[in-house]
Structure formats: structure tokens, C-alpha cells
């Protein structure tokens, strides 16, 4: 090697190696202090991109798991409300069976009717007021309600909660006060169709007969009247009857009809043209039947029991659906948590620091720094040897 002064090659080599060990030491300290192997894209460009995608998936799936838990909560809220509706329907059915007993007086029937009315009102209140985060989950709807729960990190990864329209179990929707009715001078409460008629009449639809067990005078008043001159006995406001029958001279019904239009109002009409004018159409008034409820006038407890059985069946079907969707959501949450765990482990292998490796690297580079500094000092002394040639 030539003896030169201007260029100290050995010093340059020592400086270069010292810079490398210093950079490596800084990288090791950064990884140890942050816990991350990749602190910037320059550390591992491909690894950084892969880890970033994993992070997006993990965060999306974590939120999806929370969404699924929200789905469980809304299903539980709805199912709990339906359970209370079912309890009320069970009690109404029990009362209806009690009312069917021939030993009941009119006063007994009225007392039963009062509790039935309150139970029906409570069913409506539960349906109207059951709320989850501002969503009226049981409010009367013309169509089924579907709630889509996002349970994945990608588009269209959803589970639908279907809540059937409640018209099958929401027996009626009454607002305001309900007018009274008069049969043979005795006031009756006209309310939920299928129950009010128990207080005064029994019907047999198949034979088209109506007997007035609590209104004998009404039947007697109709005696002697020809079918064409049929007498009308009505329940409700006398100027606005809500239910009417036409009796002949034997006290049996010749015809009656009560139908619902698309707005849920009731209109009264007669099947016999000869007496149609005497059974003029009239609106229900303040007692509105829920739209689509498919409730027709019933003259006895048997038909009311059928309606109640249909309502309880609808509630049971909806509760079964909600129970099944809860189980599905629980399975979904378990699967999401498992996926999150695996993706997090994969991301960790890419971007997290291995402390054993990094501590070893730090120790090695610290030693190299110390050695490099010492060697650089010696390399800087090499040009001094040229001075001996000048003596």
C-alpha cells in the first residue's frame, strides 16, 4: 500500500463499517422500543402491504363481531316482547274459555270482557313501544320488516333478521273511547271483535242462526215479523251500529254480514236484498281493526278461540325464528373471533418484533460500534507514519 497523506483508505473503511453498525444499532433499538419489525415501508415494503391488508380485515371483522352481537341483542329484545304478548294471549284465551261456559251471567261476561280489553290494549302497547336503538321492531307494518346485519369485512356479507308483519297477532288497534251498545235496553261494551258479542249473543255460522240468550225481549220484539221485514238488533252506537243481526219471527237470524275494507274500517251490510235498506252500512268508528289483520266478525267464543290460536301460532313462529337467528349469530361471532385470532397471528409474524433476535442484533452492533470506534482511531494514526520518512 502506498504511503500517502491526503487519502486515508483505512480510515474510510473503518468509518463506513462504523456507519453500518450504527445504522443497524439504531434499527434494533427502534424495533425494540416500538415492538414492530416494520416501522416504515423501507423496512419491508412487501411485508408492510400484506400486514396493512391483514389490519384492514382484522378491524373489519372485529366490527362485524360487534354487529353480530347487536343482532343478538335486537333479536333478544324482540323475542322478549313477543314472550309478553304470548302471556297476554294465553290469559285472553283462558278468559275466552271461561266466557264460553253457559253458567256465566251477563255481569260475569262483562267483567271478563274488561280484562280482555285491557290485555288487548297491552298487546298493542307492547307492539307500538318496543324499541331497539330507535327501531320499532314490532310496530304494525303493511309488509314484513327485514334488518340486514353486516357480519363480514366485505360487501354483501350480511345476515337478515326477518320480523313478520304483526297483523296476525295484533288483534286490533283501538284509539280513543269505544261507544256502548244497547240490546233490549241493556248497555254493553263494544270492543275487540270476537269478544263483545259474547255478552249478548251466541252464533252458529254453519246453520245461520242466532239466539239471544241475554236479550229475550229483542227476540220477542222480532216475533211475527216476516223475513222481508226483518228486525235489526245492533251493538254499538244506535246511530252508528257496529254489529247487527236480522231476526225473523222465530227469533233466529235470517242474515248478517260485517266486512272490512282496505283501510281497516268495518262496514255493515245485509245478504238479503229485501232487508238491505234496514241494515245500512256503518263505520266501526273509533275501534279500528289493524290493516291486514284478517279479522272478521265472530259471534261466539269458538271463533274467538280460533283467532287466538292463530295469533299464538304466529307469535310462536316468530319467536322460533328469532331464537334460531340468535343461535346463528352466536355461531357467527364464534367464527369471526376465530378468524380474527388467526389473521392477527399471521399479521404478527410479519410486522411484530422478535425480541430475542433484536436484542441479539442490538448487542452485536453495540460491540461493533465500540470496536469500530477503536479501530477508526488507530486508522487515523496511519498517516503519522509518513512523517518518519521526512526525518
Curated annotation (Swiss-Prot):
GO molecular function, a single term: structural molecule activity
Known InterPro entries for this protein?
Flagellin (IPR001492), Flagellin_C (IPR046358), Flagellin_C_sub2 (IPR042187), Flagellin_N (IPR001029)
Location within or outside the cell: Secreted; Bacterial flagellum
Look up keyword Secreted and say if it applies: yes
Which superkingdom, per the lineage? Bacteria
What does the UniProt keyword field contain? Bacterial flagellum, Secreted
Q: Which SUPFAM superfamilies does the entry link to?
A: Phase 1 flagellin (SSF64518)
Q: Does the keyword Secreted apply?
A: yes
Its GO CC terms are:
bacterial-type flagellum; extracellular region
The similarity comment for this entry is: Belongs to the bacterial flagellin family.
What exactly does this protein do? Flagellin is the subunit protein which polymerizes to form the filaments of bacterial flagella.
| PANTHER family recorded | FLAGELLIN
Protein name as annotated: Flagellin
Q: Which gene encodes it?
A: flaA
